Each structure stands twice: as C-alpha cells, then as structure tokens.
C-alpha cells in the first residue's frame, strides 16, 4: 500500500509542472503575461531615438532569460525578479 501511494505521488509530481513561472507586465494597460520557461527576469527598457525630445522615450517591457546589456541609446534599464515588478 505504501508503495502504491509513493508511486502515485511520484507520478503526480512528474505529470504536473511544479516549476514556478514568472509574470511580467508588457504594458501598463494590459494584464501581466506569464513568461516563457527559462525567462525569469522582468525588464523595462527606456530608449531614445531621433524623436525622443518630442514624444519621450520608447518604453519596452517584458520577460528575459538574462538582463540585457545597457546600450548608449537607453535612458534606463531595469531588471527585476519578482512578479510584475516592471511597472
């Protein structure tokens, strides 16, 4: 009986994905998205182009496997590891 119970527990664990998945914002007005497996970092990139002074920086939010490298056209870059931390 103990063997059967242990087998059922093991099968349940194998069949269910017990891995935690991160949720991040993709825009301020939409609900959070579940990040793909392996992408556990939420990011916010604010970058400038030739129209930056008129309309402001372009904001990109989402999930990433690693924190992107800061580039010269970024105004800011935020990488965080809690759910919906990229607001």
Swiss-Prot record:
Keywords: Acetylcholine receptor inhibiting toxin, Disulfide bond, Ion channel impairing toxin, Neurotoxin, Postsynaptic neurotoxin, Secreted, Signal, Toxin. The keyword NADP does not apply. Residues 1-21 form the signal peptide. It is found in: Secreted. One of its GO terms (cellular component) is extracellular region. SUPFAM superfamilies: Snake toxin-like (SSF57302). Its main location: secreted. PROSITE patterns: SNAKE_TOXIN. Coiled coil: none annotated. Gene3D superfamilies: CD59 (2.10.60.10). Pfam families: Toxin_cobra-type. InterPro entries: Snake_3FTx, Snake_toxin-like_sf, Snake_toxin_con_site, Toxin_cobra-type. GO terms for molecular function: acetylcholine receptor inhibitor activity; ion channel regulator activity; toxin activity. Transmembrane segments: none annotated. Expressed by the venom gland. Disulfide bonds join 24-42, 35-63, 48-52, 67-79, 80-85. Homo- and heterodimer; non-covalently linked. Belongs to the three-finger toxin family. Long-chain subfamily. Kappa-neurotoxin sub-subfamily. Postsynaptic neurotoxin that binds and inhibits neuronal nicotinic acetylcholine receptors (nAChR) with high affinity (IC(50)<100 nM). Is a selective, and slowly reversible antagonist of alpha-3/CHRNA3-containing and some alpha-4/CHRNA4-containing AChRs. This is Kappa-4-bungarotoxin. It comes from Bungarus multicinctus (Many-banded krait).
